[in-house]
Amino acid sequence: MSSKQISIVLLIVLSVTACIFSSNNKDEQAIAKKVANILDQMTLAEKVGQMTQIDMRLLDDPSDIKTYHIGSILSGGGAVPESNTPLGWLEMVNGFQKVAMENRLAIPLIYGVDAVHGHNNVLGATVFPHNLALGAANDADLVYRINKATATEVAATGIHWTFSPCITVPQDPRWGRFYEGFGQSTELVNGLTAAAVKGYQAQLSKTNGKQVAACAKHFIGDGATVWGTGTRVDGLHTYYIDRGDVQLDDKTLREMYLPPYETAIAADVKTIMVSFNSVRGEKCHGSKYLLNELLKDALGFKGFVVSDWAGIDEIPGDYKSDVINGVNAGIDMVMVPGIMEGQNQQHYKVFIQYLIEAVNEGSVSMARIDDAVSRILKVKLEIGLFDNPYIDDA
């Protein structure tokens, strides 16, 4: 190839790259403009509602979605529609969405589910091996194809968000959730993370351009807790290692557990879930250093941070201080999720009341609320929810 031909090829490559970069910039600018426009119209109550996630079983009434401007509904373990079929799920999610769209600003719900090895809550869905088995295969293309297939089935049931992939680096096989990770090697987990995220978030056919959002979890150190440091949770039981304390120094924690998150963020993961555990005695759900300074500032994460199931409840202090400390630490959406029999959890209406009070009292700044809601709206726009809030049953 002559120098002239090489120059032409380079010029074409640079032109295409510039076009893609320009297009991406325009998309980002357009979304940012839409977010700002919506945010300017929102009341404090509407903003707090967007930061609230409720389990579908724990809604007092579906009309509360409209009344309290709820931003997200989830199906926790065992939370299934009366007809546990793909059509049953689709009709349930579309029904909740219809109520949300009756709000004056018509901000759609983002519905979440633990589709962690296939769409495993739905009878008849394809079930794949857990991550530990996929880590043993160590085949990034296989992980991508499995997660894209899972996302296809998730989207077909009207759902927009899977609480996966789990990118922990588990060390102690006595931990009951060990199988959720790809393996004990940071290099192995890191090597499969991009494929896992991109598979879930691949553009799908037959969804009118709508995309499923992935959720990297659990930030951070959930596979490194020390045996005997587990948390006692009222209404549940005492854990020996789960929800325990990570006692690694900061350098080791960063070297072992940050690389997969850096990779997930580079792959444009839309959401990240906080871990139940503590790091050197401080609950991750209440750590401004971990969630704000490290995850958002240092790593540059631009999506939104979601708590785990009633995760803020385990921050020391009463529930109102839990709300204040969790949101100020950097949690954008709180999985409340509501009052469940036999568990000591708070009602979503209490969460909403306390967060509104905290803003009015100055304990949580409006800037923090606006940042959280902007991130949530941004993700909803990016995955196409505003354009196509429903999936039809075709």
Task: Please name every model-derived segment.
Residues 1-28:
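Bacterial Sec-dependent N-terminal signal peptides
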